[in-house]
């Protein structure tokens, strides 16, 4: 077990080129992230969309380093987790956690995505887990997201939907 993972520079360059060449037109979803102020490893994002016939779609998009680092899986599993002390010690090399795999604003990225669809009665009518391409519209910190979106009609509609869903589960 080495303290630092060493990855071939050619592989890193190829992976950087790959994510750089992802086209926005190839992206299935436009997403946003919400993280603590100053975060560098932005590893989850979301999209909310109201579709026809009052169908609500929620997407949870998770950065997936294994898409790039399959050959390092054994070492990654032995490392176990990212450590947050007074200094962030990433599970994988910074170039991956803070760049290649990080869901950076105005970038296209590959993710593992969970797509859920609900009707207006909060019944889950569709679900899919898949690898997808996403475009990151905006990186928010918690305060900025709340200031810009929390009181918006659109976001309040989603809050009401989530409350109905939560209450329906309590009644079950």
Regions found by a protein language model. Give the residues of each.
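Boundary/activation segment at the start of structured domains
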Residues: 1-3
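Electropositive polyanion-binding surfaces
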Residues: 8-172
């Amino acid at each position: 077990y080495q303290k630092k993972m060493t990855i071939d520079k050619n592989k890193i360059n190829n992976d950087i080129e790959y994510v750089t060449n992802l086209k926005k037109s190839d992206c299935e979803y436009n997403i946003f992230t919400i993280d603590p102020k100053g975060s560098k490893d932005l590893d989850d994002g979301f999209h909310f969309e109201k579709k026809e016939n009052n169908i609500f779609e929620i997407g949870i998009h998770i950065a997936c380093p294994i898409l790039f680092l399959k050959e390092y899986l054994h070492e990654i599993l032995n490392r176990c987790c990212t450590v947050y002390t007074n200094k962030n010690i990433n599970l994988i090399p910074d170039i991956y956690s803070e760049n290649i795999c990080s869901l950076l604003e105005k970038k296209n990225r590959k993710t593992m995505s969970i797509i859920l669809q609900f009707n207006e009665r909060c019944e889950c009518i569709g679900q899919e887990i898949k690898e997808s391409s996403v475009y990151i519209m905006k990186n928010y910190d918690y305060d900025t997201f709340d200031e810009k979106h929390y009181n918006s009609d659109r976001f309040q509609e989603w809050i009401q939907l989530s409350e109905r869903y939560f209450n329906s589960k309590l009644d079950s």
